[in-house]
Amino acid sequence: MYNPRCKDLDRDYFPSYHTTRFQDQPEPNLAVLEHFVRVTKQHGRELTEKQGITVDHLRYGEGRQLVDVFYSEKTTNQAPLFVFVHGGYWQEMDMSMSCSIVGPLVRRGYRVAVMDYNLCPQVTLEQLMTQFTHFLNWIFDYTEMTKVSSLTFAGHSAGAHLLAQILMRPNVITAQRSKMVWALIFLCGVYDLRELSNLESVNPKNILGLNERNIESVSPMLWEYTDVTVWNSTKIYVVAAEHDSTTFIEQSRHYADVLRKKGYKASFTLFKGYDHFDIIEETAIDDSDVSRFLRNIEIE
């Protein structure tokens, strides 16, 4: 267990129960979720309505396999590309709640790609991971076609889990492609699915399609990372929020250790004051701690 003192795994794997905000509300865990949905959707609307940012609506597959690419009239053709993968335990959320991070990045000269994906139980987690591999191939084709100068990827929560596949797909991410990747940012992710596979709160009626046969193959913490040297020029940041559960924090800490021991340039950061949700909400604020962190990655 990542939290040996835990007496309620369902609660430890449910991030909204660990916020210190909205304590004046009858159910803070619901209030933090409602606030997240409302604020992040507002951030998305304001990009085009108030900030003069342009968006191209693209597709990499069927169903919800969509990509929105944001930029401004000042964005150069060779601008670096920042790719964001949303969370939601592979079964919730969508692109409309995934654009908080866009504004400050576009103002700093980036193009920003926000991707969506098919959700469980319409697909199993194994199928979703295969579809995400198709997305990786698509986004690298896009960068090569548009002459992008460099890439940074960030995934939040379940999106961080999906993003981990980039390190395990040498047939898609060639050595030449990996050299384009400036940084990988794993935000508040879950990387070992063994504990949560039987939790009704996270995997009701096994909508993720987990079993003894596939549990290790869908758990990045347990993978054998062998193609490490092609990532020598890429920095990896594994990030946790102070007001997330002990299980989430320790999964992130342990995942950073796993990557370092394999030879990746990986670091672990615990963000003080943030919970699982406002660490994303505040990416919309140019001078927030998390925005400064993202800005510093550019120059490290």
From Swiss-Prot:
Biochemical pathway: Amino-acid degradation; L-tryptophan degradation via kynurenine pathway; L-kynurenine from L-tryptophan: step 2/2
Reaction(s) the record says it catalyses: N-formyl-L-kynurenine + H2O = L-kynurenine + formate + H(+)
tRNA processing in keyword set: no
Enzyme class: hydrolase
Residues the record marks as active site: 157, 244, 276
Annotated EC: 3.5.1.9
GO MF annotations, alphabetized: arylformamidase activity
Quaternary structure and interacting proteins, as annotated: Homodimer.
Known role: Catalyzes the hydrolysis of N-formyl-L-kynurenine to L-kynurenine, the second step in the kynurenine pathway of tryptophan degradation. Required for elimination of toxic metabolites.
The protein's name: Kynurenine formamidase
Record lineage: Eukaryota, Metazoa, Ecdysozoa, Arthropoda, Hexapoda
Designated gene of the protein: KFase
